[in-house]
């Protein structure tokens, strides 16, 4: 699955770059981030946390209405533990690829992402049975996303919202009884030059 996602991403970038109008830009906003966690076949209760994302993008217009954007985004992800005041924090670099259709500035979008977790850590106090070790986690993440953006007319400013659903099991040696998957809602603003 990883190879397929990367092949699609690079092929899309190559095709778009060959014959397209390109704009570059920046984006930033808030994350409402959580993870689906299961340990020993028991679903763990987690609490979403608010964090942020920031990054750059390149938007390719295939024609007047079909567009694609790709970029590199730092995203602070994770969740709060249900017991104690602990937070699981993932410092992640994501490469999102969005395909969009323009309706007079409103652009529904669907896409995929590949990510690399730079660091996975637990902060704060939790129950004594709860532990996280960075070496127990995969650093490669991937998933799919849905969203929309609105571009102001005759202006580079845009507003966006998206939901990213992680498909990768972030646990090393994970299975259907032991897994961790990302779930991230993003709301932000950006500017295209």
For every predicted segment, state its role.
Residues 81-110:
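Helix-adjacent hinge/juxtasegments
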Residues 1-27, 189-193:
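Bacterial Sec-dependent N-terminal signal peptides
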Residues 22, 46-52, 89-93, 104, ...:
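Residues that define the transmembrane beta-barrel architecture of outer-membrane proteins
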Residues 77-81, 133-136, 144-147, 152-193:
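Predominantly the C-terminal beta-signal and adjacent terminal strand-loop region
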Residues 20-59, 68:
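Short glycine/proline- and aromatic-enriched beta-strand/turn motifs that initiate or cap beta-hairpins
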Residues 26-30, 52-60, 72-74, 95-101, ...:
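Residues on the lipid-exposed face of transmembrane beta-strands in outer-membrane beta-barrel proteins
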Residues 19, 63, 103-106, 152-155:
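Outer-membrane beta-barrel channels and translocator barrels
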Residues 36-43, 80-86, 120-128, 171-176:
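Outer-membrane beta-barrel translocator domains and adjoining extracellular loop/strand segments
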